[in-house]
């Protein structure tokens, strides 16, 4: 019995051990099938890449939807006020972009043209004033020379009265001559507004360009916009400025030809959004100059004709730097004259004040005399 029990336990042990070895071997045999099943269930690298691209596209699409709503620029820290030029320009760009659906390059062009159209009546008045001044240029030059030559306060006042009378008789209000200077804060506003939008960058600036400048946040790689801007600036200066009536001397014409060429390296690192504004603004200036030089348009707009006077040969032969130096000397002389006349005026006022003090009569009543 004991031997039988021992043999039974031994056979049972062998049976269990065999089962264990058999189960381990079966597991190892099934391992490749399990790995293949896991590999088929996991996404491939291409699928993961496509999924990531879809997520990025959806995110950019959601941002693009935000940029087509009023208030987007304000939400990212731009267009914060309604009184600062750059903020006003950004508000205008946003309204045109949202309500017209134009891409950003078209929005910049549209807002630039709209602003210039609003300013066109001011340039009409300025052109008319310049033309009227050209009629009386010889008389005005004579009066101005007399005013610069005198140091007597009374005589200077008489000459100034003659000058005002001459302007009044010809219906000239020289305040319109400074009207085109309004373009300066507007240009600075456009520059700061577009530069801030490109530096952020605003959604759509990176892919809503046109032609060779698709990315409005980068500089023009071919400098095409810079050369266009320089060309139109030279054209409108040769045509008589934005009013179409300015008469530049020879040195000043050469100066305005060289200046746009200098602007090419100065603007080569600016974003294409900023230089696009310069190009469109300059192109409009050329068209405006052609309109204001046209006799039919001048007649319809009731603008006086420009009277051409022969230039001074001594000034015509001088160089650019000589002309600049002459203008600086003239400005300095005028400043010194104003200072001397102001000192003389203050001295006369002081003498009159002392004279009035000395001539003051004290009134004494009779009761005071009895005392």
From Swiss-Prot:
The keyword Transmembrane helix applies. Probably required for the insertion of integral membrane proteins into the mitochondrial inner membrane. Essential for the activity and assembly of cytochrome c oxidase. It comes from the Eukaryota. Belongs to the OXA1/ALB3/YidC family. Pfam families: 60KD_IMP. The gene is OXA1. It is a multi-pass membrane protein. GO terms for molecular function: membrane insertase activity. This is Mitochondrial inner membrane protein OXA1. Keywords: Membrane, Mitochondrion, Mitochondrion inner membrane, Transit peptide, Transmembrane, Transmembrane helix. It is found in: Mitochondrion inner membrane. The chain crosses the membrane at residues 104-124, 255-275. One of its GO terms (biological process) is protein insertion into mitochondrial inner membrane from matrix. The keyword Mitochondrion applies.
